[in-house]
């Protein structure tokens, strides 16, 4: 962690510059300039997701170049709007001739200009904070200035431009933490590689399934992992089956495909339960014991739509994580395990196994900052979904694609 955030230094320098410019142009020009600047930027933010979806594959992960282009487009559109309204403001300001009024006008102009700059920085930063871009994303997430702005704004502000944020943050995983929240990563020793070769991991294969389905709402084939937790019942992540009407499961990722239906869809926790009546596979049991820091664990699943893959893991710690739900409709608090583990797309929905083959929790995300850190919902967090999912057999709406 750097002692001084470079982005914060740039924002403070920009604030001084905008204050000087605002003082010179005055409140009347400044407020109209702000309206034009924010208006142009908001138009770009609203249109970019629509344009992006038309010219790219929905599953495409956003590159650094695309993010930079998106930010430049927003700034250019904001500047065009600002130029137009500033011209109108200059014409109006010529009519202010009383000296005290001009002092108030100048001071107000400095304040308005700085506020506008910080709001636009927060808007762009909120979107960049959800990306896994090296350096840039981390600088944004660690910004004290942007954190301060976010604390002043209403709690629901993070959901105002969710389409734009989701477009830039396509990583295949939900966000665990709110923008500008420091991700707490506890140092522990590396996982024991022998766990990946243990008989427990091989035996669990009979209860772990590959989940595949087509989501018409975004024309994507979604793939992930699930596991049998009760007769004919499979637990996975909600984002694995978001918008999927007829998911199929495959025991161990091989052989026969079994048709299932979504009977529980908890988009806030990111948990779904599938009813697969013809599935004959032993159920994994959730443990009643909590994992402690440095506890051994196993991550098993089908990353990147591949074959059965087992990785040793070690629990870093247990966290109450505040972050957006999978649709960015609001902020939720999740009880999660932070893991020293390799988690890839396709691991979503898989079990976090104990060394004796029980289930600590459900793998659902990976770190934006550290490639060796993943996250799992704890057994306590999903306890209500376990109880309801066991007795549910009616199809529910799986809404639309989440990520």
What residue ranges belong to the model's regions?
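Sec-exported extracytoplasmic/periplasmic mature domains
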Residues: 56, 93, 112, 129, ...
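Active-site region of chymotrypsin-like
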Residues: 205-212, 272-283, 309-402
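A conserved glycine-rich beta-strand in the N-terminal activation segment of trypsin-fold
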Residues: 25, 194-199, 207-231, 257-259, ...
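Short loop/turn motifs at secondary-structure junctions and domain boundaries
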Residues: 11-12, 216-219, 341-344
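Conserved active-site neighborhood of the chymotrypsin/trypsin-like protease fold
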Residues: 215-223, 230-309, 393-398
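Generic structural signal for well-ordered beta-strand positions
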Residues: 29, 235, 360-361
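Alpha-helical transmembrane segments and their juxtamembrane interface "caps"
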Residues: 1-193
């Amino acid at each position: 962690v750097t002692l001084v955030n470079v982005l914060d230094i740039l924002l403070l320098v920009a604030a001084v510059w905008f204050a000087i410019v605002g003082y010179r142009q005055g409140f009347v020009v400044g407020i109209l300039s702000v309206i034009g600047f924010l208006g142009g930027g908001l138009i770009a933010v609203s249109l970019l997701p629509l344009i992006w979806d038309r010219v790219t594959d929905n599953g495409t992960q956003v590159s650094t170049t695309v993010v930079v282009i998106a930010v430049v487009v927003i700034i250019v559109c904001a500047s065009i709007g600002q130029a137009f309204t500033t011209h109108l403001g200059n014409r109006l300001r010529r009519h202010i001739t009383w000296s005290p009024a001009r002092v108030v006008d100048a001071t107000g102009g400095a304040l308005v200009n700085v506020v506008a700059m910080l709001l636009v920085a927060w808007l762009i930063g909120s979107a960049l904070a959800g990306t896994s871009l090296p350096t840039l994303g981390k600088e944004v997430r660690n910004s004290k200035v942007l954190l301060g702005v976010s604390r002043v704004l209403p709690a629901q502000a993070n959901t105002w431009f969710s389409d734009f944020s989701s477009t830039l943050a396509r990583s295949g995983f939900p966000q665990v933490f709110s923008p500008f929240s420091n991700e707490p990563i506890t140092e522990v020793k590396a996982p024991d590689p022998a766990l990946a070769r243990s008989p427990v991991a091989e035996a669990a294969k009979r209860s772990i399934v590959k989940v595949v389905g087509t989501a018409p709402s975004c024309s994507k084939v979604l793939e992930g992992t699930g596991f049998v937790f009760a007769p004919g019942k499979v637990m996975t992540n909600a984002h694995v089956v978001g918008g999927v009407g007829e998911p199929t499961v495959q025991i161990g990722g091989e052989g026969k495909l079994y048709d299932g239906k979504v009977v529980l869809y908890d988009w806030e926790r990111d948990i779904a339960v599938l009813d697969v009546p013809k599935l004959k596979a032993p159920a994994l049991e959730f443990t009643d014991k909590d994992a402690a820091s440095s506890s051994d664990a196993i991550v098993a699943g089908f990353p990147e739509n591949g074959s059965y893959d087992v990785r040793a893991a070690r629990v870093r710690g247990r966290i109450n994580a505040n972050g957006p739900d999978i649709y960015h409709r609001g902020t939720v608090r999740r009880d999660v395990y932070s893991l020293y583990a390799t988690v890839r797309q396709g691991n979503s929905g898989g079990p976090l196994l104990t060394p004796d083959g029980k289930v600590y929790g459900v793998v659902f995300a990976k770190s934006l900052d550290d490639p060796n850190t993943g996250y799992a919902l704890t057994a306590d967090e999903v306890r209500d979904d376990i109880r309801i999912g066991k007795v549910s057999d009616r199809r529910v709406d799986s809404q639309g694609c989440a990520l």
